[in-house]
């Protein structure tokens, strides 16, 4: 973190309206739509983090209200009153010192039904000079898979997608590297039984 830089504690409108974020959310929602485990509509959902435009997209897809969280995800319990058949955590764990804590808390909040799912996305590892200064972790696939297993989840399916347009790649050497390395990993996870 550079001098004077502070971490964002709430999502602001300017950040939410960024076309890159909207593209990520659309691709994430397309992945969610591909799940055959959940019967629609579901009774309730939990979106980890503040309410964003993707929360409304999830509500429209699943046909229910999605609650959001407002606790310190590194240290505090989620303290939810209900158990959810679907939980989403899109690009959250890379911002945490202790992502295992959050995954264990999500497992407690997930409904025990075999069809319940956690949809999780995070940036794929990239060289240090391309990593975001706002991220504590950009994990290699094997480390992320180990974290998921340690938290008691199994991978139902996964995918990876790029977040840059082809024209962006032609703007220079560093943009070309970003097109090659800057990818999002997304998972559909089920609690191990």
Kindly label every feature range from the protein language model:
Residues 1-86, 90, 100-105, 116, ...:
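Conserved N-terminal segment of class I S-adenosyl-L-methionine
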Residues 91, 95:
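A short His-aromatic
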Residues 96-97, 110-114:
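Helix-to-beta-strand junctions that scaffold the AdoMet/dcAdoMet cofactor pocket
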Residues 126-132:
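A short acidic, helix-capping loop that chelates divalent metal ions and anchors anionic groups
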Residues 150-153:
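A structural motif corresponding to the C-terminal end of an alpha-helix
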């Amino acid at each position: 973190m550079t001098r004077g830089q502070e971490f964002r504690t709430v999502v602001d409108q300017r950040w939410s309206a960024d076309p890159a974020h909207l593209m990520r959310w659309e691709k994430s929602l397309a992945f969610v739509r591909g799940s055959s485990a959940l019967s629609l509509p579901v009774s309730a959902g939990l979106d980890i983090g503040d309410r964003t435009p993707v929360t409304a997209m999830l509500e429209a897809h699943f046909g229910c209200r999605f609650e959001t969280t407002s606790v310190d995800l590194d240290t505090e319990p989620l303290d939810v009153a209900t158990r959810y058949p679907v939980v989403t955590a899109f690009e959250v764990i890379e911002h945490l010192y202790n992502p295992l804590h959050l995954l264990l808390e999500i497992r407690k909040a997930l409904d025990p039904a075999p069809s319940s799912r956690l949809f999780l996305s995070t940036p794929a590892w990239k060289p240090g000079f391309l990593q975001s200064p706002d991220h504590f972790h950009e994990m290699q696939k094997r480390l992320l898979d180990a974290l998921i297993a340690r938290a008691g989840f199994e991978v139902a399916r996964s995918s990876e997608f790029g977040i840059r347009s082809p024209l962006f790649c032609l703007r220079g050497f560093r943009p070309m590297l970003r097109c090659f390395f800057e990818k999002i990993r997304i998972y559909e996870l089920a609690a191990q039984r």
